[in-house]
């Protein structure tokens, strides 16, 4: 990535250094708050240049975060940040400024909100579209406990496309909960005319006079049902003509906005007015990703997530790049191939495909359930849909996978990216459950290729199958540069990489590298298993009967994963050769680099040797 020149950013952050608690903001005037926003911007750019993290989204929410903490009182009032990746300013203001140097590092603070990290983090996050549900739950609990504090959800326009958001809005409108939803819309710009009008209208209709008049008028009109109905309809029609809030109003959630999300003064005035409304309401703000940093404003996607400096000279292709290359090559020769992704086209390597075959590419936004069943529908008409999805997000489409794909044995290929330990994103994004929750489903094939070349072969084989098939692959790069091939791997057949004696290591996916290193030291047989379902049962039984010790290793939870499948096979065949199952332990994972986590959880060569030698 383009490194920022941070020497000029190392300044004396006088105002920021004086902020020890969010309540300190209440002593500042608007001019001082604007100066503080500039200091935070400089601090974020300098800090993330060293640690990596989400830059553009956090530059876009500095002013909003300052306004929220100025008007409300956390942790009594609660902020629920959707996804949580845009809450860095919130972390800085709530006592974690000095910990930002450890952001996303092992034993450091999380890149998302985390309840165990601070009392100001009301609800943990990482996945999208959960904030309104959680904030509504908190608001209802406040009502039941006779607590007048405000529960606030901050959600982006992208996250609002998730169906769970609309489920929550539908419920919220049927309650009297003290819920404020802040819709952070960073996909639009405000023209001067609309902006000025919106500011005036929002300040007017969120003020006490308007609220009181509306309340008293409706109180009177309740005695005259027909007139009340007409008045309500007239009000909605008027607001629908000048404000884009009709949808929310129809759901029973009062709409205010849009306002400039970078104008601290108008944000504070509007939030102060909305604080006095004790029912579900939504404030629509307009922001710009990367605000205030030119390169990030011009290319917010590139600077959505920045990486720390790296000394690696590894020019091997990433697994996502290999997948994208295979997708384009195969689609060129097979017009039935369709690409589907739930808002992950860049991360999943589908950008080139979307350009080459726009009519065959479907980014369905944050809608994993829909993506899965959409693919199923296409498959019934003879198409060959490929769903590119992160392992952690496939969890959201699990019912659809079973009910709509597997039970009907539909021909859908799932390219499961970011499988295994993903590193700095931590527990919310760890793809360590897919082998366990997929292998129990009938009618499916599950492959775990060990390299980019093996991955290409696996995808070729998957494309030729007729039924549901999963190809899982990790985040990062393979150790093989050349990967294009017309070869396929035989379904259900493993590959012996190294022959040894007495000890055998069954390696799944990218665990082949540490297994080969350990195998060389132990003089052990090393098998690239390739498949989790179906297993190469004949090979496993033969290996088990001719060795004294067995080891399985996978970057999935050890509970119910690939090792468990081998153990079940041994039990069914009454084979008593001892098996050690190495996998992610049964606990919530931490964040850190992939190599740090492999070492922490015993998924490295040193630990394999230790187990094999014991």
Give names to the regions the model predicted.
Residues 187-323:
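Long, well-ordered, tryptophan-enriched scaffold segments
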Residues 99-109, 174-186, 406-418:
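A glycine-rich helix N-cap at a beta->alpha junction
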Residues 12-93, 249, 253, 260-264, ...:
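N-terminal amphipathic, basic-rich helices that act as targeting or association modules
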Residues 78, 287-394, 400-410, 507:
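Non-catalytic terminal/interface segments that mediate subunit docking, oligomerization
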Residues 242, 269-272, 318-333, 349-355, ...:
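Glycine-/acidic-rich phosphate or pyrophosphate-binding loops and their flanking alpha/beta elements
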Residues 54-175, 336-337, 341-342, 350-351, ...:
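Cofactor-binding active-site loop characterized by glycine-rich and histidine/acidic residues
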Residues 363, 520, 524-543:
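Generic long, charged, amphipathic alpha-helical segments
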Residues 309-316, 423-425, 444-445, 563-614:
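Peripheral docking tails and interdomain loops at the edges
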């Amino acid at each position: 990535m383009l490194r920022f020149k941070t020497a000029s950013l190392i300044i004396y952050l006088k105002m920021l250094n004086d902020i020890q608690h969010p309540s300190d903001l209440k002593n500042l005037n608007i001019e001082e708050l604007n100066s503080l926003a500039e200091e935070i911007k400089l601090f974020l750019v300098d800090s993330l240049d060293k640690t990596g993290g989400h830059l553009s989204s956090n530059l876009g929410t500095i002013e909003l975060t300052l306004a929220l903490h100025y008007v409300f009182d956390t942790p009594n009032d609660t902020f629920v940040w959707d996804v949580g990746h845009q809450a860095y300013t919130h972390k800085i203001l709530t006592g974690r400024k000095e910990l930002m140097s450890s952001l996303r590092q092992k034993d450091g603070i999380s890149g998302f909100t985390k309840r165990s990290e601070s009392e100001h983090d009301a609800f943990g996050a990482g996945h999208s579209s959960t904030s309104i549900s959680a904030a509504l739950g908190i608001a209802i609990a406040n009502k039941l406990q006779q607590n007048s504090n405000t529960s606030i959800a901050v959600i982006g326009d992208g996250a609002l496309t998730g169906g769970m958001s609309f489920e929550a809005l539908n419920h919220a409108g049927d309650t009297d909960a003290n819920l404020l939803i802040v819709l952070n819309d960073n996909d639009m710009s405000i023209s001067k005319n609309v902006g000025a009008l919106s500011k005036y209208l929002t300040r007017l209709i969120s003020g006490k006079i308007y609220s009181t008049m509306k309340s008293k008028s409706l109180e009177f009109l309740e005695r005259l049902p027909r007139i009340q109905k007409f008045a309500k309809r007239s009000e909605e029609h008027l607001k629908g003509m000048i404000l884009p809030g009709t949808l929310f109003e129809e759901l029973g959630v009062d709409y205010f906005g849009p306002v400039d999300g970078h104008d601290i003064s108008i944000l504070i005035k509007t939030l102060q007015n909305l604080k006095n409304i004790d029912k579900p309401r939504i404030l629509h703000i307009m922001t710009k990703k990367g605000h205030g940093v030119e390169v990030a404003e011009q290319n917010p996607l590139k600077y959505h997530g920045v990486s720390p400096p790296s000394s690696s000279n590894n020019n091997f292709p990433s697994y996502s790049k290999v997948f994208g290359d295979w997708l384009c090559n195969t689609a060129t020769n097979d017009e039935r191939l369709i690409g589907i992704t739930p808002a992950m086209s860049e991360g999943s390597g589908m950008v080139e495909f979307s350009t080459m075959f726009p009519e065959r590419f479907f980014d369905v936004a944050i809608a994993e359930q829909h993506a899965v069943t959409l693919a199923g529908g296409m498959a019934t008409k003879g198409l060959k849909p490929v769903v590119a999805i992160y392992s952690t997000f496939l969890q959201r489409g699990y019912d659809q996978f079973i009910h709509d794909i597997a039970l009907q044995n539909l021909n859908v290929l799932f390219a499961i990216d970011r499988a295994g330990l993903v590193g700095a994103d931590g527990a919310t994004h760890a793809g360590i459950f897919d082998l366990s929750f997929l292998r129990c489903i009938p009618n499916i094939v599950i492959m775990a290729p060990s390299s980019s070349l093996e991955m290409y072969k696996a995808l070729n084989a998957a494309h030729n199958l007729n039924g549901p098939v999963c190809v899982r692959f990790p985040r990062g790069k393979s150790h093989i540069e050349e990967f294009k091939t017309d070869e396929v791997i035989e379904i259900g057949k493993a590959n012996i990489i190294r022959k040894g004696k007495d000890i055998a290591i069954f390696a799944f996916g990218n665990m082949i590298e540490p297994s080969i290193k350990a195998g060389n030291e132990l003089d052990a047989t090393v098998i690239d298993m390739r498949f989790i379902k179906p297993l190469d049962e004949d090979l496993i039984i033969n290996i088990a009967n001719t060795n004294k010790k067995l080891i399985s290793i996978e970057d999935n939870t050890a509970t119910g994963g690939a090792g468990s499948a081998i153990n079940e096979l041994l039990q069914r065949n009454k084979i008593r050769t001892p098996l050690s199952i190495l996998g992610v332990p049964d606990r919530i994972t931490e964040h850190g680099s992939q190599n740090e986590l492999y070492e922490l959880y015993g998924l490295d060569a040193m630990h394999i040797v230790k187990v094999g030698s014991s």
